[in-house]
Amino acid sequence: MVTIVLNKYKLLDKIHIGQQKLEDLLFNLKSEVKPIDENNIEIEINADRLDLLSSDGIARAIKGLLEKELGEAKYNVTDTEYTLIVDNVRTRPYALAAVVYNAKIDLEELIQFQEKLHGTIGRKRKKVAIGIHDLRKVDSKTIEYKEVPLSYKFVPLYENKELTISEILEKTEQGKLYGNISIANGVSPAIVQDDGEVLSIPPIINSNKTRLDENTKDFFIDVTGTSFEAVAQTLDIIVSNLAEAGGTIGRVKVLKSANFSQLSSPLFLHKIQNVREEYVKKILGIKTSKEEICKHVMRMRMNCDIENGVIRVTVPQYRVDILNEIDVVEDIAMSIGYNNLEPSKYISTNYGSYDYMTLLERKIRELGIGAGYVEISNFVLIKDEKLFSNKYVKILNPVTDEYNAVRNSLIPGLLDFLSKNQHAKFPIRVFETGDVVVYDSSTDTGFRNDKRAAYAIMDNKVSYEDIQAPIHYILKSLGLEVNYKEENNNIFIEGRSASIFYENEKMGVIGEVNPDVLIRFGIEYPAVIAELYISEIAKRLTNQR
C-alpha cells in the first residue's frame, strides 16, 4: 500500500460529495481513508494504482463511479516547439519529456505525487526519475539529455551558489542518497539547455534555476530511466493527472542522436484487452451481459466496445495496472461494489484424503520394514563436510557448525548413523525416508525439494547382492520392473555400484561403499547402501494410474 496525504476540502470540492460517500467509494477502489486533522486526510492506496496518487487522479476515478463521466478521460493536447535530444547515456539510456500548460495544482501535492511515483514505479529512482520544471524559467526550446563530467557546475535546488557535480554528491542530501545510482566513469547524466546550462542531473537533483513556486502553472517534465516502458508509463501518468487539473498537454519532439530516430512524447500508451463474458460470470459468480460488463468498464474510466460478440476494452495510458483479462474483471467487481457481490449457495460434501506422495512414502516405509530394515530419522540439516556433492544449500548464520548445510542426499546421514552404532549387534539394517534439497538450474532459486528413501546394511561381510535383492523386491512391489546399469561415483567401489533405471529414467543409486568413504566416517566394517528417488518414482507411478 502507498499512503498519501490530501486536503479533504479541496478533494471533496472537485467531486461535490460528502466525506462518508468519499470513503465508501474509495473502499470500492481498495483504498482506505483515515482522518489526520480537521483539514487533512490520509489515504492508503494499492501500489499498482499509480493513477490514484494525486487528488486529480482520485477525482477522475470517483467521477466514473458516480457516472458523472464515463469511459476514457479526454484531454487537450497540442504540439510545441520543444525538442529533447537524447544522447548516449550509458547508465540511464532512456528519456522522454512533455510540457503541460495552465495546470492548477497544489505545489505540495505535486511534489508528493512525484515522490510517490519515485518510490513505486521508479524503484526509489533506480528505474525511473522525474524532473518537473517551471516552464517559464526554461530559456531554450532545445533540451539535450547527455553525459557531462563531474566538474560541471550549476546551482542545485535550494542552494544559492554554484557547485560541481562532485561537490553535490559530497555535500547535499540528495547527492548522498542517489549519487551512486547513475554516476559512472567520471560522468553523470544531465538535462541541459542548448546554451549548456544544466536543468537537472537525474536521478539526483534539479537546478534551482527552474525551481517550482506557488505561481507555477506551466511545466516542463522530463522522465529518465533504465526501462523505456516504465519511462513512458510514468510520463503518461503525470501529464494525465496534470491535465485532469485543467492543464493542456504539450507534445515534445524526442530525437535519438545515436540512430536518428524520432518520436513525439508523451506516447499515450494504450492497449486492447479482450474480455470473455463467461469468464466474468465464472470469476465473479454473477449473472450479467456484455452490455452490463461494458457499462462497468466505462465507470472505471476505460472505453469498451462489443465487436462481433467480443468485448474489447481500451485501456488508457493512466491505467498501467491493467495487464490482462483478470485485471479488467477486478475492475468490474470494484464498479459493482464488493459488498454487492453475494456468495452463491453451494452445497457439497467432500471428504479429505491423503496426498498421493504421502501414501507412496508410507508404502515404501512398510516395504522397508517388511524387508527386515529398521527405520531411523535424521535431521534435514547436516554438517557440510559430510556431504559428497559441493552443490548444496549453505546456512548463512548457523547456530552450530554441526548443522550448517541442508542435506542433498540421505546417504551421509545413514553413514553417520552406522559410524555411531558399530558396537551394535550385526548385521545392522536401517533405512530412512525424508526430504532433501538438490541442485536444479531450471528453478528460480537453483534448488528444489526432493523426496528420497535410503537403505544401508553393515556387517562383517556384506556385498552388492545383499542390498540389491531387497531393493529389487521393494521396487517390484510398487509395480516397477527396473534395470541396473553400472555407474561409478566417489561414494561406491568402482565396478560394484550401479544406477537404477526405469524406462531410461534414473530412479536411484546402489552399491558397496568405498573404503575411503568408510575411513572418512570412521567406519571399520564394510557397508552397502541404496538410495531411491521417491519423487521420480511417484511421477512414473502416477503416469501408470
UniProtKB/Swiss-Prot annotation:
<keyword id="KW-0460">Magnesium</keyword>
<dbReference type="Pfam" id="PF17759">
    <property type="entry name" value="tRNA_synthFbeta"/>
</dbReference>
<feature type="domain" description="B5">
    <location>
        <begin position="268"/>
        <end position="343"/>
    </location>
</feature>
<dbReference type="InterPro" id="IPR041616">
    <property type="entry name" value="PheRS_beta_core"/>
</dbReference>
<protein>
    <recommendedName>
        <fullName>Phenylalanine--tRNA ligase beta subunit</fullName>
        <ecNumber>6.1.1.20</ecNumber>
    </recommendedName>
</protein>
<dbReference type="InterPro" id="IPR009061">
    <property type="entry name" value="DNA-bd_dom_put_sf"/>
</dbReference>
<comment type="similarity">
    <text>Belongs to the phenylalanyl-tRNA synthetase beta subunit family. Type 2 subfamily.</text>
</comment>
<dbReference type="InterPro" id="IPR004531">
    <property type="entry name" value="Phe-tRNA-synth_IIc_bsu_arc_euk"/>
</dbReference>
<dbReference type="Pfam" id="PF03484">
    <property type="entry name" value="B5"/>
</dbReference>
<dbReference type="GO" id="GO:0005524">
    <property type="term" value="F:ATP binding"/>
</dbReference>
<dbReference type="GO" id="GO:0004826">
    <property type="term" value="F:phenylalanine-tRNA ligase activity"/>
</dbReference>
<dbReference type="GO" id="GO:0000287">
    <property type="term" value="F:magnesium ion binding"/>
</dbReference>
<keyword id="KW-0479">Metal-binding</keyword>
<keyword id="KW-0963">Cytoplasm</keyword>
<feature type="binding site">
    <location>
        <position position="331"/>
    </location>
    <ligand>
        <name>Mg(2+)</name>
    </ligand>
</feature>
<keyword id="KW-0030">Aminoacyl-tRNA synthetase</keyword>
<dbReference type="InterPro" id="IPR005147">
    <property type="entry name" value="tRNA_synthase_B5-dom"/>
</dbReference>
<dbReference type="GO" id="GO:0003723">
    <property type="term" value="F:RNA binding"/>
</dbReference>
<comment type="subunit">
    <text>Tetramer of two alpha and two beta subunits.</text>
</comment>
<feature type="binding site">
    <location>
        <position position="327"/>
    </location>
    <ligand>
        <name>Mg(2+)</name>
    </ligand>
</feature>
<dbReference type="InterPro" id="IPR045060">
    <property type="entry name" value="Phe-tRNA-ligase_IIc_bsu"/>
</dbReference>
<dbReference type="InterPro" id="IPR045864">
    <property type="entry name" value="aa-tRNA-synth_II/BPL/LPL"/>
</dbReference>
<dbReference type="InterPro" id="IPR005146">
    <property type="entry name" value="B3/B4_tRNA-bd"/>
</dbReference>
<feature type="binding site">
    <location>
        <position position="321"/>
    </location>
    <ligand>
        <name>Mg(2+)</name>
    </ligand>
</feature>
<dbReference type="GO" id="GO:0006432">
    <property type="term" value="P:phenylalanyl-tRNA aminoacylation"/>
</dbReference>
<feature type="binding site">
    <location>
        <position position="330"/>
    </location>
    <ligand>
        <name>Mg(2+)</name>
    </ligand>
</feature>
<keyword id="KW-0436">Ligase</keyword>
<dbReference type="InterPro" id="IPR022918">
    <property type="entry name" value="Phe_tRNA_ligase_beta2_arc"/>
</dbReference>
<dbReference type="GO" id="GO:0009328">
    <property type="term" value="C:phenylalanine-tRNA ligase complex"/>
</dbReference>
<keyword id="KW-0067">ATP-binding</keyword>
<keyword id="KW-0547">Nucleotide-binding</keyword>
<dbReference type="InterPro" id="IPR020825">
    <property type="entry name" value="Phe-tRNA_synthase-like_B3/B4"/>
</dbReference>
<keyword id="KW-0648">Protein biosynthesis</keyword>
